[in-house]
Amino acid sequence: MKKQYILLCGATVALLMAACQGGKTAAADAEAGDTLEMKYAKLLTIVKHGDGEETSDAAEGIDYQYAEALVANPWKAGTMLHRYILIPKGEEGDKTVAMLAKRRSTGARCTTDTVRTPVERSAVFIAPHCQLMYELGCQQAIRGVCDLDYINIPDVKKRAALSGNTSAQNPIVNCGSSMAPDIERIIALKPEAILLSPFENSGGYGKLDKLHIPIIEAADYIRHWAGRNG
């Protein structure tokens, strides 16, 4: 789980409860849980759930384990930009998804995305986030990128050159411009998450919003450099 939290902090990433897997709902504030202390990242709150707290089901012997990440809106104080629920893949995670669906929050405070972890296929829209994933040792999860010409990472270039080779391992698909991504390529890529940088008053993400793929809004470019790493 530590790497998931670091990745979330680093890019506000969220490989990140809501009622439907990979879907979106309105959300209330974070529920009770174990809040991780952030030394520098003031716009990010991460709460661990499980370990015998109220989410456990003693009758069924289930200890529902998941993490909740709340990203504060950097442009409007006191509001939330996005909420992410990270649920491990597998049978236990499936039960957690079902449990959270029954307990769905009705407060309309921010968009919520459920992310099954670990994320193994992602589309990364900007170079700094690609570099971050390499530094974290998560580079194999990069399966698509935008603005390839501006990504000066030799391994990304090499893997992108293999995208047409069906026998190649972990190729990277060129998804076009981050301002006008190739939706068909992204659909074919089947990413488990899309990592991008949000902007004030962007008006949403157009067709990307309709793909039902978790969009990880990483506004780390406006933070103090230390806050990008927790």
Per-segment meaning from a language model:
Residues 16-19:
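C-terminal motif of bacterial Sec signal peptides marking the signal peptidase cleavage site
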Residues 50-58:
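Short edge beta-strands and adjacent beta->alpha junctions
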Residues 184, 188, 192-230:
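Extracytoplasmic substrate-binding proteins
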Residues 68, 73-200:
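A short, structured surface patch at a secondary-structure boundary
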Residues 21-24:
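Bacterial signal peptide processing site
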Residues 26-40:
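Short Lys/Arg-enriched alpha/beta "domain-start" segment
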Residues 61-68:
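Short, hydrophobic/aromatic-rich segments at coil-to-beta transitions
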Residues 1-9:
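Bacterial N-terminal signal peptides that target proteins for export
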